[in-house]
Amino acid sequence: MEDDPLFCSPLLAEADFLACQADANELLDLAQIDSQRLAASENYPVLKMRKLHSALRQRQLLLPLWLLSWNTLTGDTRDTNGRFFRGALLMDNLLGLADQVWLAGFWLNSGLQGEAGANGKLDTSSLALHYLHGLPRPVYWVLWLWRRLRGEVVINEKNLLLLRDNGHYQLLLRNTVVFNPWLSSEEAFIQRFSQPWSVRLLGLDGRWRIKHHLFDRHHGALFPLFEAFRSQSGPDEEEYRWLMHQARPALRVSEETPASDRWQLVDSLESNALALYEFTPLNDMK
């Protein structure tokens, strides 16, 4: 990247920003994928932005990066793209990009994006927020969950993020997995990536309202719902309204008084699933 002629151009010193793209799929040929390239694709957009910043610093330039188009690993056909659920993969990259870029671009919908290509292949170089009839695609809900996050970081590990904000807490769990999207229809293969969790939070005295948002293949993913309406004519307006209602993360709310001020979670997450727990002390609700 440092050898790119752009970084030797005197025009760069006059620039107000640097526009760029980062598509993890440009690393891969799904027909002959190898484990090393697959692993490198996991955080490719974030790593590419870091390299750009490094190249700019070497030339004593501080330019905001505008990430106009980007994508994580995904399938290159309608079926493999739809079946390859990647909520956690998208969230990991959003969290990593937040302090690397000034803006990240999205298409409003897949029609404007021009996603469908020739021979049944998809253009995987960018992301669209919606599908047909305004149906939310997975990245829409990942952004929705990401925008809920606020406060200071208490713990930030690979698959766990704990935030604190004026006595409120948020716990974000991710089961980030990369594998060949062509294998997304192999249920036995997918199940091997399920991840058990055991988390204990201390110091939660009193009574709390706990909201649990779950986003996985069965709670919020659009493609499995769409499959129920596969026909030559496609869904009608009533069915589109039903899809709009169903294609969202699950929400469960409880009120708990943790024993000995300790709250414990024992659960499991499917491949690339996301779970966000939000803790609100009930004395704040008065």
Give the location of each predicted region.
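Noncatalytic carbohydrate-binding groove/subsite architecture in carbohydrate-active enzymes
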Residues: M1-Q100, A104
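Extracellular and analogous surface-interaction loops
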Residues: F7-C8, L163, R200-D205
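Flexible, active-site-proximal loop/turn residues at the rims of small-molecule/cofactor binding pockets
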Residues: A24, S110, P281-N283
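Short, solvent-exposed beta-strand-terminating loops
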Residues: E26, A104-Q113, F215-A228
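C-terminal beta-sandwich/jelly-roll accessory domains of carbohydrate-active enzymes
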Residues: R174-K286
